[in-house]
Structures are given as C-alpha cells and as structure tokens.
Amino acid sequence: LFGYLTGMATALVNMPTIVTASLAASLVPVISEAIAQKRGDVVMKRTDTAMRLANLITIPAFVGMCVIATPISAMLYATPDAGPCIAVMSFGVFLLGVQQVTTGVLQGMGKTAIPFINMVISASVKVLLSWNLTALPAWGVLGAAWATNADFGVAAVLNLIFLYKYRRYTMDVLHTVKLFVAAGIMGAAVLGAYHGAFSIIHSNTLATLAAICVGGVVYLTAIVVIRAVKPEDVQGVPKIGPKLAAAVEKLSFKI
C-alpha cells in the first residue's frame, strides 16, 4: 500500500512543482541583488510575482489531480488503487509550491537557516502524524499522505510568518481566491468531461486525456474572465512569457 503513496502519488505531486522549484532557485540571486542594493520595493515585487505565478500553476494542478485522481491512477499505473492517495496528496501541490517559493526568497535574503529550521520542525510534525494516523485502521496509508501534506503546510506557513516579520510580506488573498474559483470551475468541467467522454468512448485513457484538455481550456478562460491573471504574472515564464503576457493583455481588453 505504501507503494501507492511513495512510488505513485508522490511522483505525481512533484511533477507540477518542478516549475516552482526552478522559480524558487531563480529567485535567490535576484532577491540577493535587491537586498544588496537596499531595494525593498524590488524584493516585494519579485516575491509577489513569483508567488502569483506559482499559485497560477499549482492551484489548478491540485484541483485537477483531486477530481480525477482514480482515472489518472488507472491511466498511468494501470490500477485505480492509487487514486485515494493521489487525491489526498494533491493538496500538497499547492502547499509545496508556497514552501518552495518562500524558501527561495528567504535564502535570497540571506536567512538560509530559517527555512532549514522550519523544514526540521515540519518534518517532526510529519513523523508524529504518520506514527499516529497510519496506526488507525480507518486511515492507514492515507494517514501518511495527510501527514505529508501537513509537512508541506507547516513549512509553508512558518516561512510566510518569517517573510512577514522581515518584509511585511503577505500573500495576495484576493488573487489566490480568484485562482481557486477558476480552478473550481475547471474541476467541475473536468469531472463532467471525463464522465461524458467515458460514456461515449468507453476508454479511461482517452476520457482522462480529453478531460485534461477541457480543463486546460476552461481554466485559461476562467482566469481571464474573472481577472485572476495579469500580463505581469506570466511575463517571467521562460521563453513564452512575453507572448503569454501579450495574449492576456489582448484578451483582458476584449472582455
């Protein structure tokens, strides 16, 4: 059973956060330079942009994985049994993204010990929860999955507390709520598209792929319609950032 968690669910959770990990790594020298120049405004702007971009990616990934976790498990691993673990671990995508970005900012500020200490604390929480939750028959391996989410969440919250302490930085709540609304609309569309496609073609793989495509279109449309994305939010995306920013600006103007 733990193979479903460590070999399947965890691997899927780490895929979307590859982008946020790269984003966090790129933040370190940028923040360090701004700190050296005593440009607090640049630190805040870079931090906010990075967090908005990370959430733009991780929130829909979390919702998408959660609503069609079992079909994804069946498609990738030829078994639906990893579905519950994937559904629970999907929450960790968003939390891990926040942790990675805030860690990058703190390291860039020269506070390298803080994220390390926070990770030690969060890891201790994970061990404690895993020890207790997995022993419960009703939880089992899902207890370990929730403990992993708690690990990411505790580290993310502690990092945010220190960012507020040193820079008075807080996440843009309205922007985050808008992204969750857009992702919720997408999640409903994904679920409906999967069941609709499966009832017609009777193929889990094709129905899952169709649902993912529908979800992508719906999410992109939703974030533009409800103004959850601005050109500057996607400007920093490697290679395609300027084109994405121009497209968002044109679409926003038309709507």
Label each region the model flagged.
Residues 113, 123-157, 188, 192-213, ...:
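Membrane-interface helix-loop junctions in multi-pass transport and translocation proteins
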Residues 12, 56, 88-91, 117-125, ...:
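Hydrophobic residues within alpha-helical transmembrane segments
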Residues 91-121, 131:
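Membrane-interface junctions at transmembrane-helix termini in multi-pass inner-membrane proteins
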Residues 192-255:
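Membrane-proximal transmembrane or re-entrant/amphipathic helices at the cytosolic face
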Residues 62-67, 75, 88, 127, ...:
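Membrane-embedded alpha-helical segments of multi-pass transporters/permeases
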Residues 46-66, 72-76, 142-166, 179-180:
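Short alpha-helical transmembrane segments in multi-pass integral membrane proteins
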Residues 99-110, 160-176, 198, 229-232:
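Alpha-helical transmembrane segments
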Residues 5-95, 105, 111:
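Specific pore-lining/lateral-gate transmembrane helices of multi-pass inner-membrane transport
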